[in-house]
Amino acid sequence: MGAAGQATGYEIEQSCRFAVEDDPTLTRTFATPTNRRIYTLSAWVKTCDQNGGSILEHNTTGGVTWANITIGNRVDFFDYSSGSARIDLRTTALFHDHSAWYHLVVGVDTTQSTDTNRVKIYVNGVQQTSFGTATYPSQNFDGHLNSAVAHLIGDGTNGKLNGYLAENHFIDGQQLTPASFGETNSQGVWVPIKYTGGSYGNNGYYLAFQDSSSLGDDTSGEGHDWTANNLAAADQVTDSPTNNMPVLNPLSKGTGTLSDGNLEYTGVSGNWSNARLTLLVPDTGKWALRMKSADSYQQILVGLCA
């Protein structure tokens, strides 16, 4: 299961929505890295479908030499040179809860003597050690991620990101563990903490998505801003790992289409169709759920199942 979006001492106030129908991306050309062989990616992700959405991609040859890290129904890490796999890791663990936030950490250090220590993948603080495909990099391999070329967030060889992204760190020159970014709270739930690990390195960045007018703004202090494409101010949303909002479930719907980060459902004309969501209602207080019809359907039913 994913993280429950519980409030913690460290609050994340917003995320960036990547609504796949808008073709959103963030782009940036990296500089000469601090260390091309050593880096860490950390991101909180809430996916909207089963496809592999790109969290970080390098691709300058149209899919012949490329690398990316994706999350969909599983986590994949690929690095290909001239069509041959240098890294190919695909988790056997599946991540099907589209109502939950997942914390993904990928730590790379290809100088390690043991191959399984050269790439470590974690989800919600747990290291993933079972892979359907497991090709680890050779020792001292210079990967294509973190090289001095154009990089993408939200689009890639294996699919576009359809979901929400929050608290996205990239640290150039350090292989870190999830303990730098999260902890288990008293209820046994993995929650975020503030990163205090020091320098981000030559290519590092911290995307907190705090500025709705500039969603690619790097708030690490390094000034490594990204260019936002097809992302509007409205794509800064309050759905976050510490304030999880309900969305419609792509695994429990009719033949209609979900969009807008699984907040909108378009039915099929002339047919009954439906979509469901999971809503966690607190034990006390007064709470409201609003559903709005954006079309001229004559019969719309809204109900609760307990």
Regions found by a protein language model. Give the residues of each.
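Extracellular glycan-interaction surfaces
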Residues: 1-20, 42-50, 68-139
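Beta-strand-rich, repetitive solenoid scaffolds
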Residues: 17-19, 57-59, 66-70, 76-80, ...
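Short hydrophobic/aromatic patches on beta-strands that form ligand-binding or substrate-lining surfaces
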Residues: 41-49, 104-106, 165-170, 207-208, ...
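Extracellular glycan-recognition modules
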Residues: 21-76, 113-115, 176-179, 281-283, ...
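Conserved, ordered domain cores of eukaryotic regulatory proteins
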Residues: 46-47, 246, 251-252, 263-306
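Extended recognition patches within non-cytosolic domains
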Residues: 1-14, 21-23, 113-115, 120, ...
